[in-house]
């Protein structure tokens, strides 16, 4: 049964790809209206076990997020070509698949819930029990 945790090689290549993609997305001019002036943060790159597919999680900091993701996927082959010099040690250049990173929104939602008066009251009751017990 295969392990679900990524290997050291997957993690290392994913991090190298993340850095290379960040540079390309920051410096390249991809003549697409959805990407004009868009600031895009590459938060994570997950490599498949065979290193042929890279799932790229991005956070557009401005603009229409869905349109930006669609544009990145349309330009994936161009981006792949621009990233290839930075990953020249690889036997096969991975296929990039761009997805919206929602981890920050999830973090904000959980933080809001934890700060709500109901949860604060319940957490306060638990602290009182710990002090008495």
From Swiss-Prot:
Keywords associated with the record: Cytoplasm, Ribosome biogenesis
Organism lineage: Bacteria, Pseudomonadati, Pseudomonadota, Alphaproteobacteria, Hyphomicrobiales
One GO MF term: ribosomal small subunit binding
Protein name (Swiss-Prot/TrEMBL): Ribosome-binding factor A
Location(s), subcellular: Cytoplasm
Organism domain of life: Bacteria
Entry-linked InterPro entries: KH_dom-like_a/b (IPR015946), RbfA (IPR000238), RbfA_dom_sf (IPR023799), Ribosome-bd_factorA_CS (IPR020053)
Keyword NAD in record: no
Family the entry assigns: Belongs to the RbfA family.
Pfam families (alphabetical): RBFA
Cited NCBIfam families: PRK00521.2-5, rbfA
GO CC terms: cytosol
Gene giving rise to this polypeptide: rbfA
Subunit structure: Monomer. Binds 30S ribosomal subunits, but not 50S ribosomal subunits or 70S ribosomes.
HAMAP family, alphabetized: RbfA
Record organism: Chelativorans sp. (strain BNC1)
Matching PROSITE patterns: RBFA
The protein's role, per its UniProt record: One of several proteins that assist in the late maturation steps of the functional core of the 30S ribosomal subunit. Associates with free 30S ribosomal subunits (but not with 30S subunits that are part of 70S ribosomes or polysomes). Required for efficient processing of 16S rRNA. May interact with the 5'-terminal helix region of 16S rRNA.
A GO biological-process term: maturation of SSU-rRNA
């Amino acid at each position: 049964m295969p392990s679900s945790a990524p290997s050291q090689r997957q993690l290392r290549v994913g991090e190298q790809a993340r850095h290379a993609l960040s540079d390309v997305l920051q410096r390249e001019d991809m003549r697409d209206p959805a990407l004009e002036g868009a600031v895009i943060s590459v938060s994570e790159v997950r490599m498949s076990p065979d290193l042929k597919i890279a799932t790229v999680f991005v956070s557009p900091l401005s603009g229409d997020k869905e349109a930006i993701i669609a544009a990145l996927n349309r330009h994936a082959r161009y981006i792949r070509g621009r990233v290839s010099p930075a990953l020249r040690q690889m036997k096969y250049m991975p296929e990039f698949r761009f997805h919206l990173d929602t981890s920050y929104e999830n973090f904000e939602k959980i933080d809001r819930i934890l700060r709500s008066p109901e949860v604060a009251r319940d957490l306060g009751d638990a602290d009182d029990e710990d002090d008495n017990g």
